[in-house]
Amino acid sequence: MPRYYCDYCDTYLTHDSPSVRKQHNAGYKHKANVRTYYQQFEEQQTQSLIDQRIKEHLGQAAAFQAGAPFNQHMLAFPGAVARPRLPILPTPGMPHGFPQAPLMPGVRPPILPAPGVPGYPGAPPTMPQPGAPPGSMPQPGAPPGSMPQPGAPPGSMPMQMAPLPRPPTLPPPTSGVPGAPIPNSAAPPAIYQANPPAPAGPTSGAPPAPPTAPQPAFSYALPSEGNH
């Protein structure tokens, strides 16, 4: 009678019947062997994928290293044209047509300047100084549109706009006669006089003030008690 072979457990069963297979598959040893088998299979697949990626990376690096000597060998032939290098941006003090140095390996190219920086291409032109000889260069570092002082020598600082004058401050309003001191709340009130006395004599050469007419006195009679 043929016997059943279990691939996970690597063993033969005593009988090849459905009941015996079911009993064997329900055992803890069979389940542990199945779990171990699939863990090993997953590890093998992961390792094979890692090895494949490493081989691809090494192949690309080897092809790049082999291509560098080949390019140098091709440049040795007459009539070969070298690959153009990246251009270098000129500095403000560098004249036009200045030979550009080749880029060194591992050195970053210069950073583009901010738009509007004086001295670089694309910056707004600066106005020349009035009275300066023709062909003179404007003052470096001056803001665009700044006007230098008229008649100033070349290279002088541009004329700066004076700030607007501040409006005059008005004094606080005062009550009473103009020019009188501000009354104090703690001082006693002055006694009002209807006709102030004339001065004793002239003090500054002015004519004396005319005398004032006396005020008429009014008297009122009190009503008697018999009138009530």
From Swiss-Prot:
Keywords associated with the record: Metal-binding, Nucleus, Ribonucleoprotein, RNA-binding, Zinc, Zinc-finger
Presence of the UniProt keyword Metal-binding in the record: yes
Biological process according to GO: mRNA 5'-splice site recognition; spliceosomal snRNP assembly
Protein name: U1 small nuclear ribonucleoprotein C-2
SMART domains: ZnF_U1 (SM00451)
Top-level taxon: Eukaryota
GO cellular-component term (any): U1 snRNP
Low complexity: compositionally biased ranges: 178-190
Zn-finger region bounds: Matrin-type: 4-36
Chain positions covered by the region annotation Disordered: 105-228
